[in-house]
Amino acid sequence: MRAAKQSSTGAENHLLKALPENEVERLLSESTPVLLKRRQILYSSGNIIKFCYFPLNGMISVLSTTESGKSLILGIVGNEGFVGAAALLHPPIAPYEIMAQVETRALRVKAEVLRTEFKRGGKFQQLVMRYLHQVLSQISQSAVCHRFHTVAQCLACWLLISADRVQTEEFSLTQQCLSQMLGVPRTNITMIAAKFQDAGLINYRYGKIKIVDRQRLEKAACECYQVAKQEK
């Protein structure tokens, strides 16, 4: 519980930070600090949501997955929000697969605790409604991105969004992860990442990505990145 107390003053989760003291203390008193492993699946599509997670660092992916196991990224959640919002609906069923993309520290809260706090109608309810608007916008924009933009544009966009979520220009993402996120063969990712590296936009080695020239990478990305920045 010590880690949870630190987050109330350390502002590691922006949504919790924005709550009045009485509301955040109610949530923190019912929270459990957890360390999510890389590629740990929190929910599969169709699962009943029993817990919600407030990331303190790292990033969690929202994925649409077919019966054959193919996936496509719809959104990325960092410490600006939380995952498991469908727990506030009836029935509380996960519409998408939710996976920790990298090792992530988070606060885990029982779904019924969030439902109770939401029904109080305080600041938490207001922030959740605003945050859900951002999430829905990101998912809608993702559909446009995957349909109309090139793989290179999409890759640049999601690299930038990932960096924003983890709040550093250097982070871990394997080519296999990127392939799954974008729903394209790994060879496509290898080829495009090599071009980005040759052009001096990124450094990529052993699953470690470093954005070297953010300004030029933003120019290589589709307009979806600017939309994502405005929604954040």
Task: Annotate the PLM regions.
Residues 1-37, 82, 87-89:
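Cyclic nucleotide-binding regulatory module and flanking cytosolic helices
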Residues 161-232:
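Phosphate-/nucleic-acid-contacting segments
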Residues 18, 76, 108, 172, ...:
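Short aromatic/basic micro-patch
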Residues 75-133, 137, 141:
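Cyclic-nucleotide recognition modules
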Residues 27, 63, 85-86, 116-117, ...:
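Residues that scaffold the ATP/ADP-binding catalytic core of kinase and kinase-like folds
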Residues 40-102:
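Cyclic nucleotide-binding regulatory domains
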Residues 101-103, 118-185:
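Polybasic "coupling" helices that flank or enter modular domains
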Residues 22, 57, 81, 112-113, ...:
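Alpha-helix/helix-capping structural signal
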